[in-house]
Amino acid sequence: AEEEMSVFSAESRVEDVARALLFAPYGRLLFPVQSGYMDGDTLGSLRLTWYSHISPARTVAVVNRLAADAAAGHRIFYPIYTEEEMRRDPAKRDTGLFFFRGLTGAPVAVVSAGGGFAYVGAMQDSFPHALVLSERGVNAFALIYRPRAQTECEDLSRAVAFLHEHAAELGVDMRGYSLWGGSAGARMAAWVGSHGTEAFGQRSYPRPAAVIMQYTGLSEVYGTEPPTYSCVGTADGIASWQTMQRRTQAIRRNGQAAEIEV
């Protein structure tokens, strides 16, 4: 009955959400497919490795938003690789884009969660962002990728290519699109933003209008950065705010717009 009503709660079991018919056959990708990085049996008790301050209310809101869209007949997930590509490389079956719809014809944000290049922490680090962006009219896509720096950038580049090629079908405008990410996801956004999709196996597509980065100690500056916004906390034990501040200053010295919020 819970699924038929398209309503989940903090007491809903993670296993039941992942197997819900509304999300079939991609519900498993709502949560880490790599073992050992998730604790908790319910949406309310869900915890992800390296993250704190996860909001059960936001987790429930994310799941219910996707469920409501699916119940209304909207497609909520798009594979980024063809069936033949996934057959040749089964790991590519664990990739794709969850679509949080904004306004028809509005710009696009692609949001990539962190996870230490080991797993995808989407329920903490990309789904909540995509939900809020969509509520503000932006068409937000949360990327599920293959962890590891190279494959992450390949998957993000493929996602950008997919969105450009299917923009009309999706009802989105790729002009002025942005790349968002936290932790490892922020590095993905920065690398693809700076080097372009052509550096990671795709043909050249327009660079993003902006890169939005959260809490990652990336220091490299190549002189090809898009306008960049960064934010980080002073008490972050993993990402150095000083490193992020120095990078922001270096981007500015190259004549590009860059801001940081500490």
List each language-model region with its residue ranges.
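Catalytic histidine neighborhood in serine/cysteine hydrolases
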Residues: R252-V262
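Short alpha-helix in the alpha/beta-hydrolase fold that links the catalytic acid
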Residues: P226, S240-A250
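Short amphipathic alpha-helix adjacent to the substrate-entry channel of hydrolases
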Residues: A122-F141
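Primarily recognizes the serine-hydrolase "nucleophile elbow" in alpha/beta-hydrolase
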Residues: E154, R158-E225
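N-terminal targeting or regulatory segments adjacent to alpha/beta-hydrolase or S9 domains
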Residues: A1-R93
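Short beta-strand element of the alpha/beta-hydrolase
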Residues: A106-G115
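Short beta-strand/loop motif that positions the catalytic acidic residue
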Residues: Y229-V232, D236
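A short loop-to-beta-strand scaffold at the N-terminal edge of the catalytic core in hydrolase folds
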Residues: R88-R101, P107-V108
